[in-house]
Amino acid sequence: MENNSFNVLANNNMSSFPLFNSKIEPSIAPALIAVAPIAKYLATALAKWALKQGFAKLKSEIFPGNETATMEKVRLEVQTILNQTLQTDRVATLKAEYEGFIHLGKVFTDYVSQSTFTPATAKTHFLNMSNLLIQRLPQFEIAGYEGVSISLFTQMCTLHLGLLKDGILAGSDWGFTPEDKDSLICQFNRYVNEYNTRMMGLYSIEFGRLLAKNLNEALNFRNMCSLYVFPFSEAWYLLRYEGTKLENTLSLWNFVGEDIGGILHNDWKGALYKLLMGATNQRLANVRFNYSYFSDTQGTIHRENILGAHPTYNGEQTPTGWIGNGRLGRFSAPYSNELEITKVEQEITYNNKGDHSNSIVPANTRNEILTATVPITADPFFKTADINWRYFSQGLYYGWNIKFDDRVILNSRVPGGIPSNRLEYDGYYIRAVSACPRNVPLSYNHNYLTLTYNRLEYDAPTTQNIIVGFSPNNTKSFYARNSHYLSATNDAYVIPALQFATVSDRSFLEDTPDQATDGSIKFTETVLGNEAKYSIRLNTGFNTATRYRLVIRFKATARLAAGIRVRSQNSGNNRLLGGIPVEGNSGWVDYITDSFTFNDLGITTASTNAFFSIDSDGVNASQQWYLSKLILVKDFVNNSGFRNQVPLAPYVIARCPNTFFVSNNTSSGYEQGYNDNYNQNTSSGYEQGYNDNYNQNTSSGYEQGYNDNYNQNTSSGYEQGYNDNYNQNTSSGYEQGYNDNYNQNTSSGV
């Protein structure tokens, strides 16, 4: 895969950072560029963390010149985007919190920068800063203002995790014992999962609220998070390492047409998200808009309807593309547990009721299809869209202008011009186009025994809505060549889960934006094995003797019967890189293979069918697992390359033949994991979590869910312990114990 120029968190000049959708009222406001320097620093730090100075540099990006300018700029801009204005007293409180962080951070960094200092004092300053962040972080999770909160909360979490990494790497010079360092490692790993869960709780509340209001505002909020929130949550995981690459491949969506409200989260998860994604591992080659209009006896046009968009991917006219399942053949047995669609033809079809009594247009309708083909250029990707519609008085007229780049696809058929509504993002191109149903219930046909594929249908035709999906330029190489081309000049490659060559039956698209990718692959029950293959090619001049490791991001909420295996295949040559029978874990886990060379795998620059294959055999009926991404990194040699700086201790990794077993075998007094059966008692305004078996007992009106069997029952503002049997009874400040069966009863401040 080539190193494309756009990377949300790349160390490049500021002009290449995406600012906003440049239509009349930009959906992403330019002031959020304030977040870019933070991202720029993190991208650099992942390659080489500045020992003892990483936190100081990160703090200087969030609070430049020891001022609150960046955080205040982000807050004001997000308030404008979401039309959420914090109360004056809340703003004053947040400003006071910023100033407190600035003060303590300056005290700490100034002290440890001295040529001579007392380790015990340095340790005290470090703990004061860490504890203040833990204590005050709930101030940035504001019930009722989750949309404004999430961007501020994300930056404060980033600051804390950066501080913890500094402590892990430099703690021995700051008075920390080996046991103290283990405790910091434990805290870091716990808080990566905890902060991710809390962040997704804020996102889910706001996104669900906006979906119920209208889809346009929901997608606007989603775009903001895709640019300025989710890449940071991905950075939290990657802060464990040195020599990795942080890359955002999330799409941005623009909605044009009549507002659609009342959308449920299950509608988004089950069908709408998949519809917007189009063929997930394909790119758009041309777009066909099927529209209709009718005339009265005088030939006056009364109404024009966009009935559907027929995108064609990679020039293929036959139904292709994977939206819920990768096979055209029918299942070998009935399977109705998934509220997922398995296969959708490229052409979005709107079916009338059986008796045709609910047709939206009269019999004298003219139907036409207008087609836009790919521009004949050296870079055959649509970059801009000019799409707008006009509603005329008394509900008599609808009109459309649709233009991709310089090609007019649909001219308005109503009197008068329609103003330009240019859609464009710096560093993005158009990969998918969808027509979106308006106030129409989504239905599925679950007769798996009689249909060769499961078709998404609508109960009646619908009109007036188009959604354009923009993908970042760093995905162009794959979509242009359908393979990942590796170059010797790059030290790391990020391969999103959805950029596969093939995928097995009973595999579904899952929306997981916190991974900074367009979804993950969810593998469900099968006796044949679940598999995703990723095609790779080596560019001329590639050094096949260079040693690499493969980092695989996955989540398995139940024990996998035979584990996940990683193989490389070329002309029948298979090599097992590793396998991990994993105990159930509700959070994302990185599996890191042993180092290997492409010579070891039998792959050369002449290879034409080389694959990374991720699979699990014999998954039982109740089991499923998720694949997010692959990261190929150069092994650590001569003080350069990939290495794990924050291990998943106290988990012990014991080597067995061709297999890694992950076990919790330790005499330490703490556990890290944020696993099933987590229970927290509180009454405050939002819940975290996002997945099955979420149990919430609370007086608030929403539920998110993110981890299995998460239970929250609360009457207080927040709690800071995150291990089993943690008990905290306090009316003040913050607590610092993080071990099992920890019990603290205090009314004091610190």
Curated annotation (Swiss-Prot):
This protein's UniProt keywords: Sporulation, Toxin, Virulence
Example GO BP: sporulation resulting in formation of a cellular spore
This protein's record includes keyword 4Fe-4S: no
Keyword Endoplasmic reticulum: no
GO terms for MF: toxin activity
Gene3D superfamilies, alphabetized: Pesticidal crystal protein, N-terminal domain
Pfam families associated with the record: Endotoxin_N
Alphabetical list of InterPro entries matching this protein: Pest_crys, Pest_crys_dom_I, Pest_crys_N_sf
Chain positions covered by the region annotation Disordered: 672-750
Record's function text: Promotes colloidosmotic lysis by binding to the midgut epithelial cells of mosquito larvae such as Aedes aegypti, Anopheles albimanus and Culex quinquefasciatus.
Family recorded in the similarity comment: Belongs to the delta endotoxin family.
Note, other: Toxic segment of the protein is located in the N-terminus.
UniProt protein name: Pesticidal crystal protein Cry11Bb
